[in-house]
Amino acid sequence: MLDTEFERVSLPISDAFTISRGTQETAENLVVRISDGSGATGVGAAAPSPHYGESAATVEAVLPALLSVVESVGDPHARQRIERDRKDVIADNPAAHAAVDIALSDLAAKRLGVPLYRKWGLDPDATPMTSFTIGLDSTDRMREKAAAAADAGHEVLKVKLGTDRDSEIIAAVRDAAPDARLRVDANGAWTPNEAIRQIDALADHDVAFVEQPVPAADPDGLRYVYERSPLPVAADESCVTLPDVPAVADRADIANIKLMKCGGLGPARRMIHAARAHGLEVMLGCMIETNAAIAAACHLAPLLDYADLDGSLLLESDPYAGVPVDGDGIHLSALDDRGLAGTGARRDE
Ligand SMILES: [Mg+2]
């Protein structure tokens, strides 16, 4: 017997977050709880992205149908059957599916009395550091934000680009954080030829890689950039679900996988292994999301080359505790000490 419920939570972002497509001041997440009637509750959350056709309203509209599948199967360990039945009822809406999958995974791990990463046998010492994202702003503000992030101990910064002053921004950020490992994300803002010019200039500032230089709608452009770029190329908007992995294997060096794009931990794990099989490096990213969602991604961190799991760090405050994340890394082994299995618990509970 499983009981389910969900609620919408409005999470103010500490500093309005801007990328080449627009600005966001609040993150609307949907938190799902699944209880087994004997005191264990699994928690998960959806962070819907309008870019992938979802909103808080679309998640709210489909969650009752997805959760009725969970209740009718009634077993948190029957994730394969529940996933198949969920997809039969609602084919798309990946963030809504992810929230349910995370909450079920959390409940299954809690019933077994281990954190998720230990259920999978993963090595907590193999987690890469997460990057901290510097959103678009005036060049001076981006310089200040980069200096503040470096002061706070973040050694890896991901800089949003896609403006008419990209080279000025990267010079200012490099100046403010001379020792940081820099990555950049254009969110598809460049044309292929512009991307080559930009990436040539970025290479002079010791940038590690470039994410989504051209729009996902231009796969030939992505290959054109990949074949000419002096820096590795990561595919994010071009790499959404499992079939995209082989499709980007000759167009990118790195697959950026997100639970909210692919529909949860099960699909994300399949994408990670598919990416490895196609010779891609693996990055796990996030939306702006509460720990009730992002903690799940953190449990996969030992499988990654690159982590971009700073969504909760960008919030003014997060009502959910999760995996401790800071400039030193993603601290999975801290969960054993706290006895916190699975994903987030409310801080005030
Ligand atoms: Mg991206």
Q: What do the PLM-derived regions correspond to, one by one?
A:
Residues 42-44, 128-134, 155-159, 182-186, ...:
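Hydrophobic faces of well-ordered beta-strands that scaffold small-molecule active sites
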Residues 1-19, 23-26, 65-66, 72-73, ...:
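Haloarchaeal acidic low-complexity proteome signature biased toward cell-envelope/secretome components but also
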Residues 32, 39, 100, 113, ...:
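Conserved, mostly hydrophobic/aromatic
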Residues 4, 8-12, 27-29, 37, ...:
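Flexible C-terminal active-site loop/helix
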Residues 6-8, 22, 35-37, 41-111, ...:
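Metal- or metallocofactor-binding catalytic centers and their adjacent structured scaffolds
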Residues 217-308:
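Catalytic alpha/beta core domains of metabolic enzymes, predominantly
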